Amino acid sequence: MEMLQGLLLLWLLLNVGGVWTSRGPLRPLCRPINATLAAENEACPVCVTFTTTICAGYCPSMMRVLPAALPPVPQPVCTYRELRFASVRLPGCPPGVDPVVSFPVALSCRCGPCRLSSSDCGGPRAQPLACDRPPLPGLPFL
C-alpha cells in the first residue's frame, strides 16, 4: 500500500506540477493571418499602409502550480516558421533618403520561443501601431 501511495504521489508531482491553461482550442491556433500594417520614414512626407501576412493565434502554454518549488516554464509564442520579405516604396522622399521599406511575409507559423531578433515579444498594446504622418493607403509591393 505504501508503494502505491508513493507512486501516486510521484505521478501527481510529475503531472500536476503544471496545469495546462487550456485543454482544447478555445481560440484560433497559431497560423498566418492577413494584417494591415503601416510604414513611414521621418524624412518622407507620408505614411503607407499595406496588407501582409503575419503569425497570430493561440499557443498552448503551461503554468506551474508550485512556482517556488519548480523552475519557470518557458511560454511559447506564435512566430514565423517560414517567411519571405517584401518591400514597399514610400513616395515623395527627398533625394538621398532610401524610400524602400522591407517587411516579413509569413508563409507558415509555429509555436516556439520568442526570438527578439525576429519578433516583437511584447504583449498586447494599448493602441495599435499607427502613423505619425498622413496615411497613403494601398501601395503595391515592389
Curated annotation (Swiss-Prot):
Which locations, inside or outside the cell, does it occupy?
Answer: Secreted
Q: GO biological process: what's one of them?
A: G protein-coupled receptor signaling pathway
Q: Which residues are glycosylated?
A: N34
Q: Which PROSITE patterns match?
A: GLYCO_HORMONE_BETA_1, GLYCO_HORMONE_BETA_2
Lineage: superkingdom: Eukaryota
Cellular component GO terms, alphabetically? cytoplasm; extracellular space
Record carries keyword Oxidoreductase: no
* Sequence intervals crossing the membrane: none
GO terms (molecular function) for this protein are: hormone activity
What Gene3D superfamilies is this protein classified in?
Cystine-knot cytokines
Subunit and partners: Heterodimer of a common alpha chain and a unique beta chain which confers biological specificity to thyrotropin, lutropin, follitropin and gonadotropin.
Q: What does this protein do?
A: Promotes spermatogenesis and ovulation by stimulating the testes and ovaries to synthesize steroids.
Family named by the database record: Belongs to the glycoprotein hormones subunit beta family.
Q: What is this protein called?
A: Lutropin subunit beta
Q: Which organism is it from?
A: Panthera tigris altaica
Gene symbol?
A: LHB
